[in-house]
């Protein structure tokens, strides 16, 4: 497995909508394994394919150490391909979020407390998942990436511009 390079804001790829995965191959699964290794390397809770420069509707998530729900031993890591959001609660919960693609920033985002998604798993099998609390938040955060939306898009224009200037400065100092 390989560690993949992370795409960081303000890269234009992060603003594009990701495309569905049309066929499952060994190469698809290897890519998902590489995504997972990259997410662990970056100490993340989730990762979308676009965050490693691939505009495909693939998410990997592992919050087993922070999940408030008792789950089967093999529940994590979650491989979520071509997710569809089929339910969202009306109740919104505000919480601070971080993002591998928006380094050094914590932003308060209001999200539905619970959701239900339909997706394909690691083997291409259709699944449905009801999630609440932290898992629901992580899924929604990563799902936003598939839609070309970043957590900073929940900020006012002024605050978003300040964050983007900081990120550009950080990027210029690294390069």
Swiss-Prot record:
Its cofactor is Fe(2+). Fe cation binds at residues 99, 141, 145. The keyword Iron applies. It catalyses: N-terminal N-formyl-L-methionyl-[peptide] + H2O = N-terminal L-methionyl-[peptide] + formate. One of its GO terms (molecular function) is peptide deformylase activity. GO terms for biological process: translation. It holds the Pfam family Pep_deformylase. Its EC number is 3.5.1.88. It comes from the Bacteria. Gene3D superfamilies: Peptide deformylase. The active site is at residue 142. Signal peptide: none annotated. InterPro entries: Peptide_deformylase, Peptide_deformylase_sf. Binds 1 Fe(2+) ion. It is an enzyme of class 3 (hydrolase). Keywords: Hydrolase, Iron, Metal-binding, Protein biosynthesis. Belongs to the polypeptide deformylase family. Removes the formyl group from the N-terminal Met of newly synthesized proteins. Requires at least a dipeptide for an efficient rate of reaction. N-terminal L-methionine is a prerequisite for activity but the enzyme has broad specificity at other positions. This is Peptide deformylase. It comes from Rickettsia akari (strain Hartford).
